[in-house]
UniProtKB/Swiss-Prot annotation:
Keyword annotations of the record: Carbohydrate metabolism, Cytoplasm, Hydrolase, Magnesium, Metal-binding
Gene Ontology biological-process annotations: fructose 1,6-bisphosphate metabolic process; fructose 6-phosphate metabolic process; fructose metabolic process; gluconeogenesis; sucrose biosynthetic process
Subunit description: Homotetramer.
SUPFAM superfamilies recorded: Carbohydrate phosphatase
Descriptive protein name: Fructose-1,6-bisphosphatase class 1
Keyword Cell membrane in annotation: no
Gene: fbp
Lineage: Bacteria, Pseudomonadati, Pseudomonadota, Gammaproteobacteria, Enterobacterales
Organism for this UniProt entry: Salmonella gallinarum (strain 287/91 / NCTC 13346)
The protein's required cofactors: Mg(2+)
EC class: hydrolase
E.C. numbers: 3.1.3.11
Highest rank taxon of the organism: Bacteria
Record pathway: Carbohydrate biosynthesis; gluconeogenesis
Amino acid sequence: MKTLGEFIVEKQHEFSQATGELTALLSAIKLGAKIIHRDINKAGLVDILGASGAENAQGEVQQKLDLFANEKLKAALKARDIVAGIASEEEDEIVVFEGCEHAKYVVLMDPLDGSSNIDVNVSVGTIFSIYRRVTPVGTPVTEEDFLQPGNKQVAAGYVVYGSSTMLVYTTGCGVHAFTYDPSLGVFCLCQERMRFPEKGKTYSINEGNYIKFPNGVKKYIKFCQEEDSSTSRPYTSRYIGSLVADFHRNLLKGGIYLYPSTASHPKGKLRLLYECNPMAFLAEQAGGKASDGKERILDIIPESLHQRRSFFVGNRHMVDDVERFIREYPDA
């Protein structure tokens, strides 16, 4: 049995930018995940369920667990003195860690993805993304350090809190998964160099918004529902409502996750920096593809911390099909 810590140290030689700092940074995220796992499991017994009454930078009501997870991850990262600052979906602006100007890395995160599912005991997750800073080491980080395209990511990953808790990450050398053993308090390697199955047969989208979707996406959904034995259609529809959970299932079983623009969110709803970029990095490392329907997600130059984007991620052939339908059936 190989633990996450042992695996990270063992694989450092495969990563050209590997340093003890990056190893310690991943360990800090691991610690934060353990704390969140512990408290999610007893959320119904203590007062951390439901809405907090506050709103995040996008005007969305924050759940109590959103704030809890944000504070725990932030504390775990700051305590190691290896991160110069963070950007979070739950923070209006970047958080600069005083006394950590010497650190080389910044972290972007969605502390608790799908938190509205907590009250009904459905899987949720944590998403993280790591970059090398671009401003001089020894100075405080600025927003410039965080507004980097996804192709500059050093590492990215997610933790899914479900029937078991799993941490999945990449440093650009494949995607690896670890299951948390609460009796030992460690994450143990369960899958190395994960890949999307050759063919996907599942599509994940909130079809309740169908009437608001672009024409190309509507046509693609109909394509998924048509019978065609040569392409194994119709595909199966599966939608949990938690990006991490939907992505994880599709990574294991094969499929595509779609969150297009709508009339109410013309630029898309998912956050480019906290959700799209890290999941796109993982998808490509697992042989998949991620797009906004027209452009590779990892090539998009961010303009703001909380920028939103349409998002299509999963098996390469399925994302290719979505892009084709969007090209062939543009909105008037």
